[in-house]
Curated annotation (Swiss-Prot):
It is found in: Cytoplasm, Nucleoid. GO terms for molecular function: DNA-binding transcription factor activity; transcription cis-regulatory region binding. GO terms for biological process: negative regulation of DNA-templated transcription initiation. Keywords: Cytoplasm, DNA-binding, Repeat, Transcription, Transcription regulation. Forms oligomers. Coiled coil: none annotated. Residues 5-50, 79-122 form the SpoVT-AbrB domain. CDD domains: MraZ_C, MraZ_N. Belongs to the MraZ family. Disulfide bonds: none annotated. The lineage of its organism: Bacteria, Pseudomonadati, Pseudomonadota, Betaproteobacteria, Rhodocyclales. This is Transcriptional regulator MraZ. It comes from Aromatoleum aromaticum (strain DSM 19018 / LMG 30748 / EbN1) (Azoarcus sp. (strain EbN1)). InterPro entries: MraZ (IPR003444), MraZ_C (IPR035644), MraZ_dom (IPR020603), MraZ_N (IPR035642), MraZ_sf (IPR038619), SpoVT-AbrB_dom (IPR007159), SpoVT-AbrB_sf (IPR037914).
Length: 147
């Protein structure tokens, strides 16, 4: 289970060092991880075993609706399988870095079964948007949580 928000830095080659405490769960037995684009201009980072059922469900959706086709192209079309190097770093494809507007400072944000990877500016904008929602009613499903 991935949780927490961690500020990290990309190196000059576009590599991200995955925190040691998450490596075994993210790449069990050296399996690749999957990185893909998200419509909110961040990246999704999944263990391969968690991504495959999602990919299969997406691929099985009919492509007649233009929105469905667009999401399939985004989520499956951008998906990259990558391994970690000996230093625990993953190379982020240039197309993915460009999509999410990633520069040096990034945020790795746990979402349970996967991570989101945000640019610093994108993450700060998300935080501001979240604070703006605090006066609104809770989203469906959250009402019963005792927080």
């Amino acid at each position: 289970m991935f949780q927490g928000a961690i500020a990290l830095s990309l190196d000059a080659k576009g590599r991200l060092a995955i925190p040691a405490r998450h490596r075994d769960a993210l790449v069990p037995d050296g399996a690749p991880l999957v990185i893909t684009a998200h419509p909110h201009k961040c990246l999704l980072v999944y263990p391969l075993s968690a991504w495959e059922p999602i990919r299969d469900r997406i691929a099985a959706m009919p492509g007649f609706d233009p929105r469905t086709s667009a999401f399939k192209r985004l989520l499956v079309g951008f998906a990259q399988e990558e391994g970690l190097d000996a230093a625990g770093r993953v190379l982020l494809a240039g197309s993915l870095r460009q999509w999410a507007q990633l520069e040096k400072q990034v945020w790795l944000v746990g979402q349970g079964a996967h991570f989101e990877l945000w640019s610093d500016a994108g993450w700060q904008a998300q935080q501001e948007a979240m604070l703006a929602l605090t006066g609104d009613a809770l989203p469906p499903g959250f009402e019963s949580l005792a927080l």
